[in-house]
Amino acid sequence: MLGGDTGNIDNKKNNKMIYILYGQPASGKTTLGTMLAEHLDTPFVIDGDEFREMFTNKNYGRAGREENIRNANAVATYLNKKGERDDWSAIYCKKDGGNSIQGRPVKEGTDVVMCLVNPYEGLREELKNNNQDKVFEVFLKSNRDLRKDYHVEDFEVGNPDHLLNTDEEIEETWDRLKELLKI
């Protein structure tokens, strides 16, 4: 643990959250993010490589990374907040007095898992400021020498909620992540 804001983890786990798993390439972000999404039963995983492939931005310099991260942050915020607006519930739920739209339950937001290199603390802070008490950061660290060509020299670790070394077997790392997230 790095001393991030872990005091409100119990409040966070009762809300639909945006989980950021970030770190250098090949640190296990996608593998752990997919496992986390399955555990949370959410279809929303924003994987940096897949996300980049959807757009024309192939720039791995600072400007390209910032653009990609800002776009991912906007999508994560949208997905997380979708369905939690009071006016939506008020308009569509008045007829039957329940919490449904044509028999379908209204969601109270959605968990979103982000698996990005995300090297810039300011962009992670921007996401947290736009989603008060709904963002949980885990910095994934690995000593493996994979995909070094894509490593970011000016990586800003910042002050995440937790630091997780991913050099162990995936099952051990997954167990530690669940323990950190209290899920």
Predicted features, each with a name:
Residues 140-183:
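Small-molecule kinase domains that catalyze NTP-dependent phosphoryl transfer to phosphate-bearing small molecules
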Residues 27:
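ATP-binding Walker
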Residues 66-131:
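Glycine-rich phosphate-binding loop used to anchor ATP phosphates in small-molecule kinases
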Residues 24:
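P-loop (Walker A) phosphate-binding loop of NTP-binding proteins
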Residues 21:
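Hydrophobic anchor at the beta1->P-loop junction of P-loop NTPases
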Residues 30:
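Walker A/P-loop
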Residues 115, 131-145:
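Conserved phosphate-donor/acceptor-positioning beta-strand/loop module used by diverse small-molecule
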Residues 34-74:
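Conserved substrate/cofactor phosphate-moiety recognition/catalytic segment
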